[in-house]
Amino acid sequence: MYDSIMSVSARNALSRLSETVAEKGVGSASAPQAVPAAPGASFGEVLSQMTGSVSQKLQAAEATSIQGIKGDAPVRDVVSSVMEAEQSLQTAIAIRDKIVQAYLEISRMPI
């Protein structure tokens, strides 16, 4: 049950991140090394790729957890997969918070 709640919470966080990117219409920037993107990709496209990657990691961790419950996967693999997914989610949340913070700071600037 805890895993179900966490996966729903993670999906909600990812959807809020995607909505934030879509609503704010952030400009273009070069892609970070961790996320492969086409040259000249917009910042929004890079973030969309990142959210897709985080979503895949969360789904893989959930699948590994289910296999671990069934006894088909070693505990070490389950813990590793869940920790990797948690790290990715925390990174996505931190990036979302920084984007919102930057937007609010820009919106407070005098014209």
Curated annotation (Swiss-Prot):
Name of the protein: Flagellar hook-basal body complex protein FliE
Any GO MF annotation of the entry: structural molecule activity
Entry-linked InterPro entries: FliE
A single Gene Ontology CC term: bacterial-type flagellum basal body
Compartments where found: Bacterial flagellum basal body
Family: Belongs to the FliE family.
Swiss-Prot/TrEMBL GO biological process terms: bacterial-type flagellum-dependent cell motility
Domain of life: Bacteria
Transmembrane spans: none
Pfam families found in the cross-reference section: FliE
Keywords of the record: Bacterial flagellum
Organism in which the protein naturally occurs: Brucella melitensis biotype 1 (strain ATCC 23456 / CCUG 17765 / NCTC 10094 / 16M)
First-listed, main subcellular location of the protein, grouped into a coarse class: other
